Amino acid sequence: MKSPTTYLLPYADISWQPDNTPYANAFEDIYWSNAGGLEEKQYIFLEGCDVQYRWRTLTPNARFTILETGFGFGLNFLLTVRAWQSEPHPQNARLEYIAYEQHLVSPHDLKKMAGLFGLEAELELMLEQYPEPVPGNHTIWIADDICLHLVVGEIHDQIETLEAEVDGIYLDGFTPSQNDAMWNEALLSKLVSCLRPGGKVSTYTVAGALRRALIKYGLTVEKAKGFGRKRDMLIAEKPGDWQPASHNIKKIIVIGAGLTGLLCAKALRRRGHKVSLVDQTSEPLGALRQIKQIAIYPQLSKTPQPYSNLYLRAYQYFLRHQALHACGRIE
């Protein structure tokens, strides 16, 4: 992997066609079918992976995890959020969504998409925390029961450190003939290894190399009726009976109610744990309450380094969740 020379990756280079279909100039491909973008995504991915049917079997403290290759405009994610929020779930059940994207779509293009599909409300939740295009993992809490892990950068560089068990995989990269890196066997092997027994994979393409690779790595593969004018699509399943994953709730004591202690307690509670906060004073923050202003800044280097990239992403995360009056910009 080449060392980066800038902290920010460029946004996706997009041209809007006369019928309001976005076209990725770098990959010479469209982001969705002009026959119906929302219906296409709903049919291929949400229905292909049976997500709503499986959600109805979740138990208290369950975690349902989806992994997507090719986040793009976030249509699959926004539709999944809308579906999740449209029905009740057991106590402390949560949706985890892991998505990879080499080039984020700009906020301007995202807003145009939302206007076309009536997704303004769902997009607003995401845009409030939408990161600058800094490579790496960005954790975005859409709600207490919905967490998006948006991973920016080349997927082969980023996925090496992934440790997750997922219930469904949306394979939604650009067409294999234009984006071979998103469909090669090394990546597919890693993805399949993360899939839980009974977990499903869905995609719009029926390319022979993809079918053979999924079968090679142990999945049962079938062709299904495609969307619109497309004759076929692929659905694959890992052998075994699918069961909801349960999150182990722990009782945790955090000692110290300073800034770090409060943030740790908040993070643990958000993940469903039962937290007790212990401090020698009766008020949170103690002496820090006397401070009228604080300055938060990342430690950066002249050129991006692993540690400075981590600091920058942590800084962005802090700003997203503390409702601070931030100023300045990242360049």
What are these regions (language model features)?
Residues 184-197:
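A short glycine-rich, Lys/Arg-flanked "PGG" loop and its adjoining helix->strand segment in the class I
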Residues 198-205:
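Conserved beta-strand signature within the Rossmann-like core of class I S-adenosyl-L-methionine
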Residues 207-248:
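Class I S-adenosyl-L-methionine
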Residues 250-277:
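N-terminal Rossmann-like FAD-binding beta1-loop-alpha1 element of flavoenzymes
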